[in-house]
Amino acid sequence: MPDVRILEPFATPRTKLGFLLDWRVTMKCNYDCSYCSGHDNKQSHPDKELCENMLAQALRYVDRVMKVKKKTMRSVTLNIYGGEALYHPDIEYLLEKSSELYDQYRDRWSLIRMLTTNASSNEKRWANVLKHLEYVQFSYHAEGPGKLKENYLRNLSATHNSGKRYGGVIMMYP
């Protein structure tokens, strides 16, 4: 048996070995599903300036990593989630800031901002948020209230009509 000293992903012409940056912008959620332990509504939202500084620092770090990667592998996914990310009172500002902060790196590496969300926000907020995303991961919650499910469907339709990429997951128990 060969002596394996290192394990690396196998790259093919179709494989793009990117970089995943997880950004949990809040622990709070506007739902209280029986199957979810991923939120804490007792904990306050992180301060807007702290979030902005953390994002700026993370992008600087990513830029350093991207400098040593092959040009064809310089791709970053910023996974924005929470509790429920859209429940953060400053999420529109933070997403807009993500666009501004990324501008200085745009010519060096690509960024896909992916929001994982229950999509329960109102129409105006959704339109503002969508401007600063490349991908939306919709999380449908079977236990969610009816009105918020209507918002989910409306926001899913708006995302589809915008031409943005999206996917979905259905959350239920049992």
Segment roles from a protein language model:
Residues 55-79, 88-174:
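Radical SAM/AdoMet-radical enzyme domain recognition
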Residues 1-13, 35-37, 110, 133-135:
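Short charge-dense sequence patches
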Residues 10-53:
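Canonical Radical SAM [4Fe-4S] cluster-binding loop centered on the CxxxCxxC motif
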Residues 82-83:
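Active-site beta-strand/loop signature of hydrolases that rely on acidic residues for catalysis
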Residues 1-22, 68-72:
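N-terminal [4Fe-4S]-dependent radical SAM core
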